[in-house]
Amino acid sequence: MGKDTIADIITYIRNADMNKKGMVQIPFTNITENIVKILLREGFVENVRKHRENDKYFLVLTLRYRRNRKGSYKSFLNLKRISTPGLRIYSNYQRIPRILGGMGIVILSTSRGIMTDREARLERIGGEVLCYIW
């Protein structure tokens, strides 16, 4: 049974978010780096830095929270894995789903790399639907 690195990073982020941790440390791979760059660019993550520990590299993410009227902090990061190793989901550029009417993003793995749904529609290419983020 293989590892699903995308599901692992989604789980790391979701668990840190539920426990109200400000930072989460995820293992560094090329795929995780590309997904984290998208999260940073789209404003779902506040800061990212690369960290080395015992000859292994990690990405340390600072999660973004918004302050509620009552003074408590509320996260606004929801992630859902779509295509799994056992069931791959592909979509052409015309059928890429819109999350919350365009408020969320879909991360796709295309022949030109990992990108968001908006970028894939602009370049008119489809690919494997990795996850939804809203």
From Swiss-Prot:
<dbReference type="InterPro" id="IPR035987">
    <property type="entry name" value="Ribosomal_uS8_sf"/>
</dbReference>
<dbReference type="InterPro" id="IPR047863">
    <property type="entry name" value="Ribosomal_uS8_CS"/>
</dbReference>
<protein>
    <recommendedName>
        <fullName>Small ribosomal subunit protein uS8c</fullName>
    </recommendedName>
</protein>
<keyword id="KW-0694">RNA-binding</keyword>
<keyword id="KW-0689">Ribosomal protein</keyword>
<dbReference type="GO" id="GO:0009507">
    <property type="term" value="C:chloroplast"/>
</dbReference>
<keyword id="KW-0687">Ribonucleoprotein</keyword>
<comment type="function">
    <text>One of the primary rRNA binding proteins, it binds directly to 16S rRNA central domain where it helps coordinate assembly of the platform of the 30S subunit.</text>
</comment>
<comment type="similarity">
    <text>Belongs to the universal ribosomal protein uS8 family.</text>
</comment>
<dbReference type="GO" id="GO:0019843">
    <property type="term" value="F:rRNA binding"/>
</dbReference>
<dbReference type="GO" id="GO:0006412">
    <property type="term" value="P:translation"/>
</dbReference>
<dbReference type="InterPro" id="IPR000630">
    <property type="entry name" value="Ribosomal_uS8"/>
</dbReference>
<keyword id="KW-0150">Chloroplast</keyword>
<dbReference type="Pfam" id="PF00410">
    <property type="entry name" value="Ribosomal_S8"/>
</dbReference>
<comment type="subunit">
    <text>Part of the 30S ribosomal subunit.</text>
</comment>
<dbReference type="GO" id="GO:1990904">
    <property type="term" value="C:ribonucleoprotein complex"/>
</dbReference>
<keyword id="KW-0699">rRNA-binding</keyword>
<keyword id="KW-0934">Plastid</keyword>
<dbReference type="GO" id="GO:0003735">
    <property type="term" value="F:structural constituent of ribosome"/>
</dbReference>
<dbReference type="GO" id="GO:0005840">
    <property type="term" value="C:ribosome"/>
</dbReference>
